[in-house]
Amino acid sequence: MPFKTRVTEMLGIEHPIVQGGMQNVGYAELASAVSNAGGLGLITALTQPSPEALAAEIERCRSMTSKPFGVNLTYLPTLNAPDYGAFAKVIINAGITIVETAGSPKVREIWEMMKPHGIKIVHKCTSVRHALSAEKHGCDIISIDGFECAGHPGEDDVGGLVLIPAAKDKVKIPLLASGGIGDARGFVAALALGAEGINMGTRFCATKEAPIHDNVKAKYVENDELGTNLIFRKFHNTARVGKNSVSDEVVEISAREGAVFEDVRHLVSGAQGAALLKSGDLDSGIFWAGMIQGLIHDIPTCQELIDRIIGEAEEIVKGRLSGMVA
């Protein structure tokens, strides 16, 4: 039984399941596999070295799926900012109809470029106040990120069980629940809390089509819900990453009195993280990981994963939950 929501209607997808944009993971292989399975796959724009490379990756994805897919474009905290406008123009010229964004309020500049072309904007937020601001400025769907998520959970430390319904109470546009979701139980819970779909990152990393080393996938299966570290807290740019010797060292150095970001910069470079995903050397850098690791027990195909979530969700709704109603 398909679950029909405003998200499936707006995005033209079969199931309200979105693969979040992930740096050095969101390539055509994964995006097309998710879309072919009835969800929404996303190519990560800034994983590509140039706007021209993004255009080629979009065409490569089109050769692998006839289903809708989108592009993620995140405003990163960096000293050497990429040419966001050039990447946005490639997205527009390629006829992409769905874009996931995240990052600073400056991201609205590319919304203004894209909205006249009918592009649907899905914006990732970690607080209700940010979600309300995004809605006010023309966003179409909010992806609300609970504290359990991989990547940047914000500085408020509010878990999805509270954050999702809190956002639903105030935001009128559709919500995707993100962070700590990886199976049918989380999917049904998200719908009950007021979301109209889910966004998964770490769970899609542990699939056969994810273009990362098997050692990394195995680590997601091996780890439990405690297998993450929160880094950069002192620098007000909190990030949740997989627990390993490098992230342990980042936490230890950051806890020292007077510590500054320069003290850990050599440990957390994006180049090292990208190399880790390719080499499988789990102590050569940091890698993104959410608390959902505790509920990841296998490495299925994207089709198997999505089919399982939808099938088991139907069983929960029609079976276990309905049986509780007197």
Task: Give the role of each language-model region.
Residues 154-176, 182-326:
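Conserved active-site-proximal phosphate/metal-binding subdomains
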Residues 1-170:
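Active-site entrance/lid segments in N-terminal catalytic domains of soluble metabolic enzymes
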Residues 22, 180-181:
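Active-site metal-binding loops of divalent metal-dependent hydrolases
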